[in-house]
Design a protein with these regions (language model features):
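N-terminal Rossmann NAD(P)H-binding glycine-rich loop of SDR-like oxidoreductase domains
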Residues: 6-28
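Substrate-positioning beta->alpha
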Residues: 98, 159-160, 179-200, 207-211
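Conserved beta-loop-beta element that borders a ligand/cofactor-binding pocket
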Residues: 115, 135-157
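Mid/C-terminal beta-alpha module of Rossmann-like enzyme folds, strongest
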Residues: 199-262, 276-309
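NAD(P)H-binding glycine-rich loop region in Rossmannoid oxidoreductase-like domains
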Residues: 40-98, 102-105, 117-121
Length: 309
């Protein structure tokens, strides 16, 4: 897909990553049709002058209608936790199947699909199992597909960063799982958006799966230290919580709380996290992602405001 007049269907356009992807595609002169759930149709994208298609990836008919007249699709929809009818199976598997079917029906050949770093590594969680099923659906689609597996994505609008900022800003020590040696490889949301925009036009990436992470590999302890230093201008103390105790607490909270601080699956994913080799993506897309701390410093004011600090 190289025509400047091409229209791109973007699912998840109102989300954290979607907001940046849509802005990047429009900056590069591409027309965007945003698939937006009816309860979000009056937020953000409409004010930006986007073409809105109301629908839900779980509803095949609405996705099929949204895909008509498009030449490419970027599928970004995903959830980290299940809520009611928004289950991993419904959103990741059924939703991706509906997007693939809609692309086929509408003659959309190019599909760039967002998965997650850790998919395909055998981590036994509902999140990763369904991400892997979604990847299989894309690979078997017959389309010109590219799969992108980002690590933790950071930016001032992201719920993860907002919650982490609030955590380090609380009074008292920052709690760690064990010694806090779990690994993060944060990648900036604007670099992820740039990568998606390049992938749409770079057909050499078709049929490939790319792990995408930032250049810095941080322990959870060092991640918190960086947040405190940049956002608060000071160091924080830590409280190491034994992993078995965290595991037991997560299990109990999952059974008694509607929105627990951490779920057993999330804890398993954190414990199983491993860094990725960033070289294949850097070679394919022609750039290195930005380092974490200077980028965080550049948007620190926005993040403080978003977190209410």
């Amino acid at each position: 897909m190289s025509e400047s007049t091409a229209k791109v269907l973007v699912t998840g356009a109102t989300g954290f990553v979607g907001h940046s992807v849509v802005a990047r595609l429009r900056q590069e002169g591409l027309a965007v049709r945003a698939l937006v759930r009816p309860d979000r149709a009056r937020r953000g994208p409409e004010a930006e002058g986007l073409e809105i298609a109301e629908g839900d990836v779980r509803d095949a008919a609405s996705v099929a209608e949204a895909a008509r007249g498009c030449q490419a699709a970027v599928h970004l929809v995903g959830i980290l936790r299940e809520h009611g009818e928004q289950t991993f199976q419904a959103v990741h598997v059924t939703g991706t199947g509906n997007v693939v079917a809609a692309c086929r029906s509408a003659g959309v050949r190019r599909l760039v699909h967002m998965s997650a770093l850790g998919a395909g590594r055998g981590t036994d969680t509902g999140y990763f199992r369904t991400k892997e099923e979604a990847e299989a659906c894309v690979r078997q689609s017959g389309l010109d597909w590219t799969i992108v597996r980002p690590a933790v994505i950071h930016g001032p609008r992201g719920e993860f960063m907002i919650q982490m900022a609030r955590l380090v800003a609380r009074r008292g020590p920052v709690p760690l799982v064990g010694r806090g040696l779990q690994v993060l490889q944060p990648v900036w949301v604007e670099d992820v958006a740039r990568l998606f925009a390049i992938a749409l036009r770079r057909h050499a990436t078709a049929g490939q799966t790319y792990d995408v992470g930032g250049p810095d590999i941080l322990t959870l302890r060092d991640f918190y230290r960086t947040l405190a230093r940049v956002l608060l201008g000071r160091e924080k103390r830590f409280a190491a919580v034994p992993t078995p105790l965290v595991r037991a607490g997560a299990w109990l909270a999952a059974h008694v709380a509607s929105n627990p601080p951490v779920t057993p699956d999330e804890l398993r994913m954190l414990q199983a996290a491993r860094p990725c080799d960033t070289r294949p993506a850097a070679e394919a897309f022609g750039f290195e992602p930005a380092p974490f701390e200077p980028t965080l410093a550049a948007y620190a004011g926005e993040l403080r405001a978003a977190a209410g600090l």
